[in-house]
Amino acid sequence: FYRIIAYYKLKNPNKFNLTYVKKKIKKIKLKDLNDKKLLPNEIGIEASIISKNKKIRVLVDDIQKKYAYKPPNKYSGSCLDGRDITYKILPDADFKFFLTANLKTRAKRRYKELKKLNKKIKYNEVLNSIKQRDKSDYKRKISPLKKTKDSILIDTTNLSIKKCFIKIKNIIDKSLKKNKS
């Protein structure tokens, strides 16, 4: 949600205020959150800044909880990601995962992603941006990035998206099967 709000801010900086955000947020559809226009680095940087705003954070928290507890009709559940999902938004979630990868792997992945968008960016710029973001995310006062004790740590450094998905699915399936017995 923060990326789409950042997109709105960068597109209409003069209109950007809490009333504007409330109006825009009501119109967001799930498919909007996967739009490629939300992937550029400048959107991520702005999203990080916006997510420190307590009033916007309350709006987004409420929406995330709504999607988690009352997913759209055609869905029987939900999967949310974010720095504070496991301890603030959904502390009672059935399954919690904390995905990580080493810095160079994350930088390579992000660099490839940005290159696909035809962004003129250097690998070292991406690497430094991620270093800064990590520093900011772990040390921030409002909703820092942290792993909860009950979250399962998955290092994705050597995993493809598909292999990561399968690993998570297997953990969930095994747990559900165990609980049925």
Give residue ranges: language-model regions:
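Conserved phosphate-donor/acceptor-positioning beta-strand/loop module used by diverse small-molecule
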Residues: 91-112, 120-132
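Basic phosphate/pyrophosphate-binding loop/patch that engages nucleotide-derived ligands
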Residues: 14, 113, 117
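SF2 helicase motor core recognition
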Residues: 85-91
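Phosphate-binding beta-loop-alpha motif at adenosine-nucleotide cofactor sites
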Residues: 94, 147-162
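ATP-dependent small-molecule kinase phosphotransfer cores
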Residues: 2-78, 84, 104, 108, ...
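C-terminal alpha-helix
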Residues: 167-178
